């Protein structure tokens, strides 16, 4: 019986110590996604449209690209990761 009480006390002390610990072991960096990763370098025009924009973006290593005409993009080819 003494061994059971001792082991139960020991387990409870370990649980108490773990719950009072200030270490944040599961923390990790949060990396932004979405528009912040977009690249809008080229200007779109009547001769440089969505097709050429997407092709240039893919050749630059992005997954896709499209011409955006609304502010704040102001008719630019934006490449997406």
Curated annotation (Swiss-Prot):
Record GO cellular component, one term: extracellular region
Signal peptide: 1-27
Keyword Metal-binding: no
Main location: secreted
Domain of life, source organism: Eukaryota
Swiss-Prot/TrEMBL keywords: Antimicrobial, Disulfide bond, Fungicide, Plant defense, Secreted, Signal
Disulfide bond entries: 40-79, 44-67, 53-77, 57-78
InterPro entries given in the database record: Defensin-like_dom
Subcellular location: Secreted
BP GO terms, sorted: defense response to fungus; killing of cells of another organism
A Pfam cross-reference name: Defensin
Keyword Signal among record annotations: yes
Family assignment from sequence similarity: Belongs to the DEFL family.
Name of the molecule in the record: Defensin-like protein 45
Organism: Arabidopsis thaliana
């Amino acid at each position: 019986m003494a061994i059971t009480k001792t082991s139960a006390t020991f387990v409870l002390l370990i649980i108490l110590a773990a719950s009072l610990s200030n270490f944040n072991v599961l923390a990790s960096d949060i990396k932004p996604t979405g528009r912040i990763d977009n690249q809008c370098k080229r200007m779109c025009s009547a001769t440089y449209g969505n097709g050429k924009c997407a092709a240039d973006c893919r050749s630059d290593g992005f997954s896709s690209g499209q011409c955006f005409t609304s502010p704040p993009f102001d008719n630019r080819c934006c490449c997406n990761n």
